[in-house]
Structures are given as C-alpha cells and as structure tokens.
From Swiss-Prot:
GO molecular function annotation: transcription coactivator activity
Stated name of the protein: Swi5-dependent recombination DNA repair protein 1 homolog
Source lineage: Eukaryota, Metazoa, Chordata, Craniata, Vertebrata
Organism: Gallus gallus
Keywords linked to the UniProt accession: Coiled coil, DNA damage, DNA repair, Nucleus, Transcription, Transcription regulation
Disulfide bonds: none
InterPro entries named in the record: SFR1, SFR1/Mei5
Amino acid sequence: MEEAACGKLTSLCHTPKDSGTAAPQRTSSGKQPMSATLRERLRKTRRSFTTNFAVAKRLKVDTEEKDCTDVDNRCLPKIGMDCSTLQDGSECLEQNCTVNTYFKSPLQENNLCESAENVVRVDLGQQQSLGEKVRLMKQVKEKEELLRRLKLVKMYRSKNNLSELQALIVKWRSSTQLMLYELQAAFSADGKKVSLSQLIDTFGLEDHLLHYSRAEEDFVDT
C-alpha cells in the first residue's frame, strides 16, 4: 500500500521540468521507482507527522495529569472536611466526657462523703461499744468484790457466835474511848490542849465505829 501511495504522490508531484525529460524506467515488477526529491519530501512529511503525533500525545498526557490534579483538588477539600468533621466529633466526645465527668463528680463526692460518714459512725459505734464494755467490766468487778465479802461474812458467821462478836466489838469500843480520854488528859497536863477529833484523826479511826460525834466533841454512848 505504501508503494501505491508513493506512486500517487509521484504522479501528483510532477513538474513541467519533469515532463520534458524522458520517462522514468520501471522496475521488473512494473512499478516506477521513487525519485530522490519525492523521497526527501516523504521523509519530511513523515517527520512532521511524527512530531505532531508526539505533541498531541504530550498534550493528551498533560490533559490527563491536569484532570487528575483537578480530581485530587476536588478530593482534598472533601478529605479536609472529613478530617474537620472527625476532629469536631472528637472534640464533641471530649466535651461529652467532660460533662459526664462533671455530672459524675458530685455523685462520687456524695459516695465519698457517705463512706466517710459511715467510717465515722463505725468508729463512734466502736468507741461506744468499748466504753460500754469497760463500764460492764467495772460493774462485774464490783459485784465480784461484794460477793467475796458476803462470802467471808457468811463464813465468819458460820464459824463464830454473833453474840460473842458483838460483845467483843463493844469491849473494843469502850477500851478505845477510854484510851482517847486518857491521852487527852495527858496532853492537857503538859499544857497542850488536844481535842478528841485530833486524836481520832491521828490514829486513823472511824467515827461511827467509836460512836463519836464531832458536833458535840464527845462519844454519844459513854
């Protein structure tokens, strides 16, 4: 097909100069050979076509790159908006968490206060229980001491005659009263006035055992 096209181009490119010359020789196949001028023109035409094709191809590539750039530019704002949306969402979540923490903190404070009050109540209850325990132990000790004395009295009564004990007590009282009178008289003889109350306090005696009256400064059953 190229040879046919070249033949047509050769017939079209004949100049008057060429018409005056002898007819070109034909090849064995019956086709007329291409002249040097036609080959040069065909080479230039082919080079121009190749150049235009390269320019068109480059323009196509540039157009595709521009389209991709436009697509990327259209996508970037969307991605930016998505990131902004995500950031806003995270901020909202943080605000919600802060609000929840704010609402929970009074409850937690109330729980802490209730726990502290419960601890104080437990401590007070333990202190009261401890005080009650000490008081009961003291009462038990007093009762045990009273019971011990009653047992001793019962034992003495079972072993001794009460009338004899009463007689001994009366004898001890009268002898003690007499001794105190004699001491008072002895101090008075030396020029020292001493009362019976001072003598009783000096010896550590009890008034009710001696039947002594401090108001009258004398024994009431002498």
